[in-house]
């Protein structure tokens, strides 16, 4: 693994290795024996979007592994925000840092940056992919279920970065994946092409009740990220009936898990009652961002 830009960069073996290392690092942290695997290493945390979990988990993770993490707001603190070409920023930061984490908009920009930087680059979220979040989701499922193989995962929501990454990650991990989106909100075409190679292990539906039937894990994410705008009003109409409620969860298995990448908009993509019922799972998932990202850093920079 040279970079982590999207889930399809990984083989099934690499995916499971990340989860194995993450579980080891989590156990070592709980025991107070975290190794200084990044001693003498520096990591640039370049963010073009606001962040709570991605920023803080990477900052803490680099510190716990003995490295130096520098946060920078790409829009307001770097010359890239005033027009410096991306290719110049990439080649400069690659001379200073051992690794760059970038949270940005266009996947194509991230891919170009990785080609030029000369150091490992990690996707902290783009409009196309969110691999760090999905690795945390898979870790949480494996911790609680003991295996990923054969588990039925149902994603309900917008066919955006979370859907794209869950589909690929779930299928690579041996899961059965159902994605439920309204018409007009399908996942990326290349993701669907990848998924259809898995035959009956993948289904794309528009009816939430059909999708959650006998699911082991239900996953949702915010789909209304610009409240008060015409786009928000349109999405509220288009996603009517896509809220994960107690009644909808009755169609899943009695012990089904519920995951949410956060932030959660209670009353929109998920009811407040269902969120609180599954809060332990959701906040385990949030914690596991720290552990999987430490694992990715350790693999890329320490050769684990």
Regions inferred by a protein language model and the residue ranges of each:
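Adenosine-phosphate binding glycine-rich loop
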Residues: 255-256, 261-304
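Rossmann-like adenosine-cofactor binding region
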Residues: 196-273
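Positively charged, low-complexity intrinsically disordered leader regions
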Residues: 1-56, 60
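Active-site cofactor/substrate anionic-group-binding motifs, chiefly glycine-
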Residues: 42-43, 47-96
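Anion-binding alpha/beta catalytic cores of soluble intermediary-metabolism enzymes, centered on
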Residues: 81, 98-169, 260
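Active-site-proximal loop->helix
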Residues: 70-93, 116, 166-169, 186-200
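Glycine-rich phosphate/diphosphate-binding loop of Rossmann-like nucleotide-binding domains
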Residues: 48-60, 143-221
């Amino acid at each position: 693994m040279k970079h982590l830009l999207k889930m399809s960069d990984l083989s099934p073996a690499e995916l499971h290795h990340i989860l194995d290392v993450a579980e080891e690092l989590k156990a070592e942290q709980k025991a107070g024996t975290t190794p200084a695997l990044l001693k003498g290493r520096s990591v640039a945390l370049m963010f073009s979007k606001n962040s709570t979990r991605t920023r803080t988990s990477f900052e803490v993770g680099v510190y716990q592994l003995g490295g130096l993490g520098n946060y920078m707001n790409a829009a307001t603190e770097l010359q890239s925000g005033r027009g410096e070409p991306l290719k110049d920023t990439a080649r400069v930061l690659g001379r200073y840092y051992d690794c760059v984490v970038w949270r940005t908009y266009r996947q194509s920009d991230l891919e170009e940056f990785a080609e030029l930087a000369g150091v490992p680059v990690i996707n902290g979220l783009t409009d196309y992919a969110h691999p760090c979040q999905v690795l945390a989701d898979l870790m949480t499922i494996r911790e609680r279920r003991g295996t990923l193989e054969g588990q039925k995962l149902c994603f309900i929501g917008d066919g955006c970065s979370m859907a794209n990454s869950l589909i690929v990650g779930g299928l690579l991990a041996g899961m059965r994946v159902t994605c439920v989106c309204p018409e007009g909100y399908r996942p990326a075409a290349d993701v669907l092409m990848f998924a259809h190679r898995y035959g009956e292990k993948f289904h794309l539906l528009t009816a939430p009740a059909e999708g959650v039937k006998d699911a082991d894990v239900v996953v949702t994410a915010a789909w209304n990220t610009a409240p008060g705008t015409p786009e928000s009003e349109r999405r509220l109409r288009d996603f009517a009936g896509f809220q994960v409620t107690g009644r909808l969860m009755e169609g899943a298995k009695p012990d089904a898990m519920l995951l949410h990448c956060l932030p959660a908009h209670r009353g929109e993509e998920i009811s407040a009652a269902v969120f609180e019922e599954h809060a332990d799972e959701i906040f385990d998932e949030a914690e596991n961002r720290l552990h999987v990202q430490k694992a990715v850093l350790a693999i890329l920079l320490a050769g684990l």
